[in-house]
UniProtKB/Swiss-Prot annotation:
SUPFAM superfamilies: 2-isopropylmalate synthase LeuA, allosteric (dimerisation) domain (SSF110921), Aldolase (SSF51569). The gene is cimA. Residues 9-258 form the Pyruvate carboxyltransferase domain. Pathway: Amino-acid biosynthesis; L-isoleucine biosynthesis; 2-oxobutanoate from pyruvate: step 1/3. Keywords: Amino-acid biosynthesis, Branched-chain amino acid biosynthesis, Isoleucine biosynthesis, Transferase. It comes from the Archaea. The keyword Transit peptide does not apply. This is Putative (R)-citramalate synthase CimA. It catalyses: pyruvate + acetyl-CoA + H2O = (3R)-citramalate + CoA + H(+).
Length: 500
């Protein structure tokens, strides 16, 4: 199967350039450097760190990344303009992604020029960049709508002038795998060719794979598929498709893909869709009784790849679709051992809660189990009071007082907002007995109006296990505190049971 591909496939990551062009995304130089370091650790070959001509901030970021000693090729986007190339040289990059419009639509409508002028601009820019010691990747913008004969001429001439690599840009995502299989081979014969796809019609991944099969040797990608409009081809999806479907060793450290995805989502402020392949919250989550039963017997029954491969863990959640096997497994994980008759009662109550439209959390399951099994437990933590101060020009600050195993503990903390401050104060209050971190936080307004009942779902971890709990109040801070305290209690109680 590896014979489908030619030389070693390369990954050109443009998260910090094309990805940052996602509407509303703006990264600081330090944030860009953090992401670049993570990209290098994952194993991409080229990092397009930004556009040197875009702004002083982008130049500072590119310079910082170029000087970071990451051990990968650092590139910047440039137009066929000497000023752009001078800025690239000033930043100390290894290469330039020299982008030239090649479709008549772009040449005539955007540039107000003709083909001959654009071809000459490309050659002149290649000459200028090579004279300054740069690696040049000559990219045909809107190549999928270009006259392919003209595109081939531009590419061939660019290579004659010293271009090291070429790139076919499907700028608005109009390519299909069938067209790709026909159009890529003659271009790949000219020089090493990259494929750069946008995902406007959902074909980005399929077109990228088709291009690699047809002779392209490098995939342009972004983490989480970030990019303008509908985004670009996602790094994590291309890598795992090649690994899992074609048996190709990408040499990417796949176990770092999910941590990288979470990092980029956090720094860009772009949330991950729950059902996004590979990295979405639900990508390795199961509820259906039939599926969960199969997963418990053999994970490959309902999973295309092991979650650990990409740095994930499997989750089985409970709801109206759950069966006895998944409920029993969840109960056993929490330390409960019901009889068959008790299990059926618990399953019925779980389904009833799901029918009410609720997500059944670990706290819900524990409450149901303890009621059915007639278990009485004393909580490790008891909330006595909390206070939050927040407002315009005021650093959000929270103070909480808890009874921890009967001993009163008071802690204060600041945060990015009142909820963040309250959760941090709670975390500090239990720091002496456990290191607990918040993994996921979700808010829903259950009712309408200004006095709406707010439901908060929080997932916490102590490094060994996770627990999900829920709080419901008209005050979002109170609901958050309730959910976190409940989750902490579940983790601490299970830890104490394991020690016994």
């Amino acid at each position: 199967m590896i014979a489908l591909f030619g030389e070693k496939l390369r990954f050109f990551d443009t998260t910090l350039r094309d990805g940052e062009q996602t509407p509303g995304v703006s990264l600081t130089p330090d944030q860009k450097c953090i992401i670049a370091t993570a990209l290098a650790a994952v194993g991409v070959d080229v990092i397009e760190a930004g556009s040197a001509a875009a702004s002083p901030g982008d130049r500072a970021a590119i310079r910082q990344i170029a000087n970071a000693g990451l051990g990968v090729e650092v590139c910047t986007f440039v137009r066929a303009m000497t000023g752009d190339i001078d800025a690239a040289v000033e930043c100390g990059v290894d290469s330039v992604h020299l982008v030239v419009p090649v479709s008549d639509l772009h040449i005539q409508k955007k540039l107000r020029k003709d083909r001959a002028t654009v071809a000459a601009m490309a050659n002149k820019a290649v000459d200028y960049a090579k004279e300054r010691g740069l690696i040049v990747e000559l990219s045909g913008e809107d190549a999928s709508r270009a006259d392919q004969s003209f595109l081939a001429e531009v590419f061939a001439s660019g290579v004659e002038h010293g271009a090291d690599r070429l790139c076919f840009c499907d700028t608005v995502g109009l390519m299909t795998p069938e067209r790709t299989a026909l159009m890529i081979p003659p271009l790949a014969a000219i020089a090493p060719l990259s494929i750069h796809c946008h995902d406007d019609l959902g074909f980005g991944l399929a077109t990228t794979i088709a291009a690699l099969k047809a002779g392209a040797s490098c995939a342009h990608v972004t983490v989480n598929g970030l990019g303008e409009r509908a985004g670009n081809t996602p790094l994590e999806e291309v890598v795992m498709a090649l690994e899992r479907l074609y048996g190709y060793d990408t040499r990417i450290r796949t176990e770092r893909l999910y941590p990288l995805s979470v990092l980029v989502s956090r720094l860009t402020g772009v949330p991950l869709p729950a059902q996004k392949p590979i990295v979405g919250e639900l990508a390795f989550t199961h509820e259906s009784g039939i599926h969960a039963d199969g997963i418990l017997k053999d994970p490959s029954t309902y999973e295309p790849l092991a979650p650990e491969t990409v740095g994930r863990t499997r989750r089985i959640i409970l709801g109206k679709h759950s069966g006895s096997a998944s409920v029993e497994a969840a109960l056993q994980e929490s330390g409960y051992r019901p009889t068959p008759a008790q299990l059926q009662v618990i399953v019925a109550r779980v389904k009833h809660l799901g029918d009410q439209g609720h997500r059944v959390t670990d706290g819900d399951l524990a409450a149901i189990a303890e009621a059915v099994l007639e278990v009485s437990t004393e909580p490790v933590l008891v909330l006595k009071q909390f206070t939050v101060v927040s407002g315009s020009g005021v650093l959000p600050t929270a103070s909480v007082t808890l009874l921890v195993n009967g001993a009163e503990v008071t802690n204060a903390a600041t945060g990015t907002g009142p909820v963040d401050a309250a959760i941090e104060a709670l975390r500090r209050s239990v720091a002496d007995v456990a290191a607990i971190s918040l993994l996921e936080y979700h808010v829903d307004a259950i009712t309408g109006g200004t006095d709406a009942l707010v439901e908060v779902t929080a997932t916490l971890s102590n490094g060994e296990m996770t627990r999900t709990s829920r709080g419901a109040e008209t005050d979002i801070i109170a609901a958050s505190v309730e959910a976190v305290v409940q989750g902490m209690n579940r983790l601490l109680r299970r830890r104490d049971e394991d020690r016994r």
